[in-house]
Amino acid sequence: MNDVKSILVNGLWKNNSALVQLLGMCPLLAVTSTATNALGLGLATTLVLTLTNASISAFRRWMPGEIRIPIYVMIIAAVVSIVQMLINAYAFGLYQSLGIFIPLIVTNCIVVGRAEAFAAKNGPLLSALDGFAIGLGATGAMFVLGSLREILGNGTLFDGADGLLGSWARVLRIEVFHTDTPFLLAMLPPGAFIGLGMMLAVKYLIDERMKRRAAKPVVVEAAAEKAS
């Protein structure tokens, strides 16, 4: 149970691939112009991470150490191809929006990094959980950044959700405020960098506050021991 909790906390917060490791910056900055695109690529990446981690862990005993990286890439490429075909079949609008960034998951440092750092050393179940947690953490960061940029840029949220979830999802579209002229800075790459910087700053402040709260009982206990 402790292992499961540690994996989830590390993947979602402490070792977040986007906000701590700063991996996968290319899709993170390029695709997060809307919340829907960010959520779509994030979920695809999570699925790839979960399946590749489990597969690599299951076959790790039969992988020669000298050629393990090419084998990882072949497994990742096979899983990405399957995910790409599924998105093409069931979410064609999203497939068109994400474009080249779906096959580029193969070269994403997050996927290869978790295969080498965790899946090659642990069992399939824990490896699948690690991939799921890391992917969910990256998806959360993408979604927050995509939502921030979409709201500031277009004044909407979940615009184009029907491309990901089907025609019923048109009702999810929210017009936060009306604008006749989009705020281009938020929609272009500079806005992605600024938004990511703000998210990094907020995470740093939260972590520092949590550290101070955790340190207070220790200080009080030490003071009580001195007094006695």
From Swiss-Prot:
Gene Ontology biological process: electron transport chain
Membrane topology: Multi-pass membrane protein
EC number: 7.-.-.-
Assigned GO CC terms: plasma membrane
Keywords, in A-Z order: Cell inner membrane, Cell membrane, Electron transport, Membrane, Translocase, Transmembrane, Transmembrane helix, Transport
Pfam families cross-referenced by the UniProt entry: Rnf-Nqr
Subcellular localization: Cell inner membrane
Superkingdom, taxonomy of origin: Bacteria
Primary localization class, coarse: membrane
Membrane-crossing segments per the record: 18-38, 69-89, 92-112, 125-145, 182-202
Enzyme class, UniProt record, top EC level: translocase
Assembly information from the UniProt record: The complex is composed of six subunits: RnfA, RnfB, RnfC, RnfD, RnfE and RnfG.
PANTHER family reported in the protein's UniProt record: ELECTRON TRANSPORT COMPLEX PROTEIN RNFE, ION-TRANSLOCATING OXIDOREDUCTASE COMPLEX SUBUNIT E
Record HAMAP family: RsxE_RnfE
Function as written in the Swiss-Prot or TrEMBL entry: Part of a membrane-bound complex that couples electron transfer with translocation of ions across the membrane.
Family, similarity comment: Belongs to the NqrDE/RnfAE family.
Name of the protein: Ion-translocating oxidoreductase complex subunit E
Species of origin: Cronobacter sakazakii (strain ATCC BAA-894) (Enterobacter sakazakii)
Gene: rnfE
